C-alpha cells in the first residue's frame, strides 16, 4: 500500500515539502507549461514495497508480480516488470526522508511530462532545501529528499 500523506514524513521534510508543494502549485512557469497541479505519489515506504520495486528488471516476471501482490501494490504489467525503477534497497523513503511528486495535467498524473516541467519542479524543490533526484547519474525526477 502506498503512503501519500505528508504526516508520514520526518518533521523537517514535512515543513520543506509543504513549502515546496505550495510554491510548485502557484508557479506561473509550471502553469504556462500545462501543469494544473502537483500530486504526492509516495512518502513513507514499507520495506515490502521497496523490495517489490527493487525486484523489477532483476527477477523473473512472475516473481515480480508476486512481490507486487504481496506488498499490496497494483497489478504490474509484463512491460513494467522488466524495467528497473530503483537501484537500492536502502531508500530514504523507508525512513520518511523522501517524497515523490508528480505534475498533474487536466487533473491526471503526467508521468511523461517534458524535461522542462521536471526541471522546474526540481529547481523549486531545491530552493526549499530539498535534494532533487533529477540531478543524479541515474535520474529519478519525481524524487526529493533530505
Regions found by a protein language model. Name each.
Residues 29, 35, 58, 129-132:
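Short aromatic/hydrophobic-glycine micro-motifs
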Residues 36-55:
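Acidic helix-start/capping segments at beta-turn-to-alpha-helix junctions
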Residues 75-146:
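Catalytic cores and adjacent binding grooves of peptidoglycan-active enzymes
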Residues 42, 72, 136:
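Glycine-rich, histidine-containing beta strand-loop boundary motifs that form or position
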Residues 1-42:
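Active-site acidic/histidine clusters and adjacent loop/turn architecture
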Amino acid at each position: 500500500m502506498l503512503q501519500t500523506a505528508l504526516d508520514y514524513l520526518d518533521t523537517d521534510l514535512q515543513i520543506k515539502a509543504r513549502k515546496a508543494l505550495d510554491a510548485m502549485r502557484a508557479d506561473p512557469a509550471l502553469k504556462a507549461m500545462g501543469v494544473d497541479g502537483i500530486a504526492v505519489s509516495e512518502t513513507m515506504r514499507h520495506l515490502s514495497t521497496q523490495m517489490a520495486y527493487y525486484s523489477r528488471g532483476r527477477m523473473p516476471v512472475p516473481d515480480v508480480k508476486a512481490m507486487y501482490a504481496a506488498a499490496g501494490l497494483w497489478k504490474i504489467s509484463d512491460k513494467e516488470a522488466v524495467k528497473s525503477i530503483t537501484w537500492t534497497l536502502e531508500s530514504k523513503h523507508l525512513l520518511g526522508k523522501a517524497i515523490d511528486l508528480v505534475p498533474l495535467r487536466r487533473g491526471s498524473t503526467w508521468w511523461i511530462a517534458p524535461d522542462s516541467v521536471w526541471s522546474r519542479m526540481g529547481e523549486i524543490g531545491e530552493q526549499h532545501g530539498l535534494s532533487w533526484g533529477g540531478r543524479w547519474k541515474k535520474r529519478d525526477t519525481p524524487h526529493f529528499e533530505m
